[in-house]
């Protein structure tokens, strides 16, 4: 039987010279493998007498435990060294700038809606909302739009069924509000509206903001003052002027188209007028005591003018290259 002390010393030196786990596994095989020196020593126990065998077996087991302990110690040291090398190679330079994280932004139409609401709130208007699917009564009849009016035709209006439509304007919000509240009333009604139309300046879905002011002594002069003040502040132009051209709308009398001064000329911006007595009758307001004005502006139109966009469809094509300009 080999000298057991020699095996321990040799194994410790052998393990210490190993630089990798693969080298260590090869060294392990020389001592603990099928043909390893300790395995051979255990096989040699059969040649000993019954009296010698217990002591020799115990001695071999002690040596085996010491060899395994030396093996584990070296394996742990190699793994620790490899981990330290890996960490050193992956050191993070904390002085480098962080990766930029893309952030979202509001759609330009949403930006315009927020600005419109903020400006009108600052002069005492409340913001009112209503359903986008309206009954025939609220979208047409209560607004003095007769049954034979072209606006009721299928080529202009999206019908949900015989009695309900996708609202063609936010005027129904005003009708609901006048039914529920008593004068004086001072509101704007922003929101989505729907019409059968689509080209560079029209979309089947677009946004409107309509205004309504009902009180005892309201006049066209109040209407002009409110609209001009709003447009001057919206476009940040104190020299901006507003003019009115006679027009016709079933729900206002008199009615007018509104133009604003723009690039040396005049640009149509919306419609307006004094609330028709028939509309007041439908909502239970005494037209002898109260007067009111109403106006409507296209939100996409305001957005196009404010940001210099010449095609309405760009707002709804979801091209991030375009939309990021406004974020």
From Swiss-Prot:
Its EC number is 6.1.1.20. InterPro entries: aa-tRNA-synth_II, aa-tRNA-synth_II/BPL/LPL, Phe-tRNA-synth_IIc_asu, Phe-tRNA_ligase_II_N, Phe_tRNA_ligase_alpha1_bac, Phenylalanyl-tRNA_Synthase, tRNA-bd_arm. It is an enzyme of class 6 (ligase). One of its GO terms (cellular component) is cytoplasm. It is found in: Cytoplasm. The keyword Oxidoreductase does not apply. Keywords: Aminoacyl-tRNA synthetase, ATP-binding, Cytoplasm, Ligase, Magnesium, Metal-binding, Nucleotide-binding, Protein biosynthesis. Its cofactor is Mg(2+). Mg(2+) binds at residue 253. GO terms for biological process: phenylalanyl-tRNA aminoacylation. Binds 2 magnesium ions per tetramer. One of its GO terms (molecular function) is ATP binding. The keyword Aminoacyl-tRNA synthetase applies. Gene3D superfamilies: Bira Bifunctional Protein, Domain 2. Its main location: cytoplasm. It catalyses: tRNA(Phe) + L-phenylalanine + ATP = L-phenylalanyl-tRNA(Phe) + AMP + diphosphate + H(+). Pfam families: Phe_tRNA-synt_N, tRNA-synt_2d. NCBIfam families: pheS. Tetramer of two alpha and two beta subunits. Belongs to the class-II aminoacyl-tRNA synthetase family. Phe-tRNA synthetase alpha subunit type 1 subfamily. This is Phenylalanine--tRNA ligase alpha subunit. It comes from Methylobacillus flagellatus (strain ATCC 51484 / DSM 6875 / VKM B-1610 / KT). The lineage of its organism: Bacteria, Pseudomonadati, Pseudomonadota, Betaproteobacteria, Nitrosomonadales.
